[in-house]
Amino acid sequence: MKPSIHSLAHQTMQEWVLEQGEKKFRADQIWEWLYRKRVQSFEEMTNLSKDLIAKLNDQFVVNPLKQRIVQESADGTVKYLFELPDGMLIETVLMCQHYGLSVCVTTQVGCNIGCTFCSSGLIKKQRDLNNGEIVAQIMLVQKYFDERGQDERVSHIVVMGIGEPFDNYNNVLNFFRTINDDKGMAIGARHITVSTSGLAHKIRDFADEGVQVNLAVSLHAPNNELRSSIMKINRAFPIEKLFAAIEYYIETTNRRVTFEYIMLNEVNDGVEQALELTELLKNIKKLSYVNLIPYNPVSEHDQYSRSPKERVLAFYDTLKKKGVNCVVRQEHGTDIDAACGQLRSNTMKRDRQKAVAAVNP
């Protein structure tokens, strides 16, 4: 299986063209074709020799993903289901924000974190995505606009799709370098956000990288008992260890951390939990931001339901009165398979039903 050309960082591309007996500037030409002109085949790179094009075709593919399903929401959100070369399925989401086009990318096939409210973990992790497969998601979303003649450009990236990004640490870091490169997509690091469920040791590593990418932490509960009951990762990285890593990150980078908090009716959404959360954040209040997330129900997790608006507002008001910066997240794609992993799991379920029907007509 040939790798995607998008797997190569610019420096690696330079090394590759030199190995082929070409001049270093050929790497710049290839990158311009890929990221500025956004061609879909090597044959479209008209200023390259036939010999170099043949070598590119022999060793790489441009696009490793196949588009299976596209769902468009009335609010402009678009959800994509892509098939990988090995037949595995992943999701990518485009959100039209007031500040530009934001793409939520997937980093793993399946997820081992095991959050009890999330559809992403219904299917266990099969493998990591490589850098090229993550970059290709953005390129295909951009192609969606290019083919419609819309002069719009993907400007923001959130690494919050299926999987735990810090469990695929090196590929995700290489992905950041590729999309941030001025010769490529040139997406500013401060326009990129990566979300972790709480791998404390990787948060420390990320602090030491010195990158300007924003950090978000999926917290979802203010104490160990509750968090362990809905997020099994808390047993490995309890709140004390997690917050020690977060404080290290803030001290090292002086950058704000966003805390994601999904609102589960009568589970974690009471005023009591809001007060616990304010206590948890008291030492880092100035550099913390809480994102309250309305829950998208998942049929396989019917023990949970969405918090009523009055409970969300009471929680929000409690945080604000205690001086915690917070917001209730704007919803996107509520009229399509909105929950993370839902489109993928529903499609796989339908595929299995079709297979059974074919065997037992």
UniProtKB/Swiss-Prot annotation:
PROSITE patterns in the cross-refs: RADICAL_SAM (PS51918)
EC main group: transferase
Active site: E91 (proton acceptor), C340 (s-methylcysteine intermediate)
GO CC annotations, alphabetized: cytoplasm
EC number: 2.1.1.192
Cysteine pairs bridged by disulfides in the record: C104-C340
UniProt keywords, alphabetically: 4Fe-4S, Cytoplasm, Disulfide bond, Iron, Iron-sulfur, Metal-binding, Methyltransferase, rRNA processing, S-adenosyl-L-methionine, Transferase, tRNA processing
Catalytic activity as recorded in UniProt: adenosine(2503) in 23S rRNA + 2 reduced [2Fe-2S]-[ferredoxin] + 2 S-adenosyl-L-methionine = 2-methyladenosine(2503) in 23S rRNA + 5'-deoxyadenosine + L-methionine + 2 oxidized [2Fe-2S]-[ferredoxin] + S-adenosyl-L-homocysteine; adenosine(37) in tRNA + 2 reduced [2Fe-2S]-[ferredoxin] + 2 S-adenosyl-L-methionine = 2-methyladenosine(37) in tRNA + 5'-deoxyadenosine + L-methionine + 2 oxidized [2Fe-2S]-[ferredoxin] + S-adenosyl-L-homocysteine
SUPFAM superfamilies, per database record: Radical SAM enzymes
Co-factor binding details: Binds 1 [4Fe-4S] cluster. The cluster is coordinated with 3 cysteines and an exchangeable S-adenosyl-L-methionine.
Radical SAM core domain: residues covered: 97-329
Cofactor(s) for this UniProt protein: [4Fe-4S] cluster
Transmembrane segments: none
GO BP: rRNA base methylation; tRNA methylation
Subcellular location: Cytoplasm
GO MF term set: 4 iron, 4 sulfur cluster binding; metal ion binding; rRNA (adenine(2503)-C2-)-methyltransferase activity; rRNA binding; tRNA (adenine(37)-C2)-methyltransferase activity; tRNA binding
Binding of [4Fe-4S] cluster, residues: C111, C115, C118
Pfam families reported in the protein's UniProt record: Radical_SAM, RlmN_N
Main localization of the protein described in the UniProt heading: cytoplasm
Binding site for S-adenosyl-L-methionine: G163, E164, S195, S218, L219, H220, N296
Task performed by this protein: Specifically methylates position 2 of adenine 2503 in 23S rRNA and position 2 of adenine 37 in tRNAs.
Any further remark recorded for this protein: Reaction proceeds by a ping-pong mechanism involving intermediate methylation of a conserved cysteine residue.
Family of this protein: Belongs to the radical SAM superfamily. RlmN family.
Name used for this protein in its record: Probable dual-specificity RNA methyltransferase RlmN
Species per Swiss-Prot/TrEMBL record: Streptococcus pneumoniae serotype 19F (strain G54)
Taxonomic lineage of the native organism: Bacteria, Bacillati, Bacillota, Bacilli, Lactobacillales
